Amino acid sequence: MSNNIRIEEDLLGTREVPADAYYGVHTLRAIENFYISNNKISDIPEFVRGMVMVKKAAAMANKELQTIPKSVANAIIAACDEVLNNGKCMDQFPVDVYQGGAGTSVNMNTNEVLANIGLELMGHQKGEYQYLNPNDHVNKCQSTNDAYPTGFRIAVYSSLIKLVDAINQLREGFERKAVEFQDILKMGRTQLQDAVPMTLGQEFRAFSILLKEEVKNIQRTAELLLEVNLGATAIGTGLNTPKEYSPLAVKKLAEVTGFPCVPAEDLIEATSDCGAYVMVHGALKRLAVKMSKICNDLRLLSSGPRAGLNEINLPELQAGSSIMPAKVNPVVPEVVNQVCFKVIGNDTTVTMAAEAGQLQLNVMEPVIGQAMFESVHILTNACYNLLEKCINGITANKEVCEGYVYNSIGIVTYLNPFIGHHNGDIVGKICAETGKSVREVVLERGLLTEAELDDIFSVQNLMHPAYKAKRYTDESEQ
């Protein structure tokens, strides 16, 4: 045997494994069988950590129940700590994220890596599985069908905590701009038509509150992930486990993760059902819808600058055209739009894969995992990208904003309590026909005085409309 290889054996025969590899023959075959993408399990450190946490919890439970030798359990626990605390072997998970087998390749990859780390800690060589075996010891009282989804759930839950932090930081960025723009009057619009005045601060605060609602929704649905089927083994009957194992393993998992994990009410149902993933990714889709809408608004509000709304200025980040000089585009809102489109597409993937299970197992969980990890990852990055490269640098064109208000026919709505709806119709029609302002027409018709208009159209009143009429002209008067 060469110093560069070691021989390992499985159901299908013997294979040469690189001597320095911590993975084994099962992982090697998975590498050879699945070459779909350039994305590996190693590229998702949260997933690796989630799987290792499951293995640590299982080893702790097995140690307490004496289902494996104490020295072996201690070696597995120590191997898990090497990965969790020191990042050891995070590059030893080379299996493609797209894979058949319901996650068996990921589970065995984890078993092999931990077994070989444990063997070294015990003073043995990699591959000397007679002392510490990937199946008989690391995978004791487990099946891929409970270990894999439990590790996946822990990993997604951990990732969602980071996403929530990113959303909150973005929300705070909008809130800061809301305060900065609180006294800037602008025209509100419905159906892209002038409606009634508001402040730019109110518009940005609405963005902030919108994101606050999404945080609550994500946190609420994320709790579904903490109901796990650890101890279910193959189909949920708990085959080859002591009756005490499942609740004890889940208790140990809660200790290892720091999350309030609980056993599923029915392990057979939990092993076959993927409804929690549909719910959680649905929350991600809802966030994507809201973020995309915000970016649409930012692009529209900054449009122009000469022939658009031009109410706000986005930071100028790069030249916008290879042919048109001096053109700058809203590239960050555009990329966030695209992120949101991808997340919405991933939601369809999760939905179809969750529906595709048969009988006691859904073998499509790997693609659910790929979609969910990708969605959480790109949404997290999008929040920071939008905050740092766009929101923090937004400035307002106060004169433009206020000019739209005072030149708009829409502000005649504010005069309804003072001049009546019918007179408002007449004023609006004259403004549209002549191009005159509402103020000009109202004064010409003697409906209100300069002083009254100054009071009604003050920033304070437009921000907080007072409906108690100081003067009212009956609609019958002409």
UniProtKB/Swiss-Prot annotation:
Effect of R15A: No effect on kcat. 2.7-fold increase in KM for L-aspartate
GO MF term (any one): identical protein binding
Region (SS loop): 320-329
EC top class named in words: lyase
List of residues binding L-aspartate: T104, S143, T144, N145, T190, S322, K327
pH dependence: Optimum pH is 8.7. For deamination reaction, shows maximum velocity at pH 7.3 for the metal ion-independent activity, and at pH 9 for the metal-activated activity.
Induction statement: Expression is independent of the nitrogen regulatory system, and none of the nitrogen sources, including L-aspartate, influence aspA expression. Glucose represses the expression by fivefold. Expression is also regulated by the general stress response factor, sigma-38.
Outcome after substituting H26Q: No effect on kcat. 3.1-fold increase in KM for L-aspartate
Active-site residues, Swiss-Prot/TrEMBL: S321 (proton acceptor)
Residue stretches spanning the membrane: none
Family annotation (Gene3D superfamilies): Fumarase/aspartase (C-terminal domain), Fumarase/aspartase (Central domain), Fumarase/aspartase (N-terminal domain)
Substitution effect: H124L: 30% decrease in Vmax. KM for L-aspartate is almost unaffected
Pathway: Amino-acid metabolism
GO biological process: aspartate catabolic process; aspartate metabolic process; glutamate catabolic process; nitrogen utilization; protein homotetramerization; tricarboxylic acid cycle
Assigned EC number: 4.3.1.1
GO cellular component: cytosol; membrane
Main function: Catalyzes the reversible conversion of L-aspartate to fumarate and ammonia. In the reverse reaction, consumption of fumarate is observed in the presence of not only NH4(+), but also hydroxylamine (NH(2)OH). Is specific for L-aspartate and cannot use structural analogs of L-aspartate such as D-aspartate, DL-alpha-methylaspartate, DL-beta-methylaspartate, DL-threo-beta-hydroxy-aspartate, DL-erythro-beta-hydroxyaspartate, L-cysteate, L-alpha-aminobutyrate, L-asparagine, L-alanine or L-glutamate. Represents the central enzyme for nitrogen assimilation from L-aspartate in E.coli.
Entry similarity comment: Belongs to the class-II fumarase/aspartase family. Aspartase subfamily.
Description of how the protein assembles with itself and partners: Homotetramer. Dimer of dimers. Isolated dimers can have enzymatic activity. The dissociation process from tetramer to dimer is reversible but the dissociation process from dimer to monomer is not reversible. Interacts with the T-loop domain of the nitrogen regulatory protein GlnB (in the presence of the GlnB effectors ATP and 2-oxoglutarate) or with uridylylated GlnB (with or without effectors).
Protein name: Aspartate ammonia-lyase
Protein source organism: Escherichia coli (strain K12)
Gene coding for it: aspA
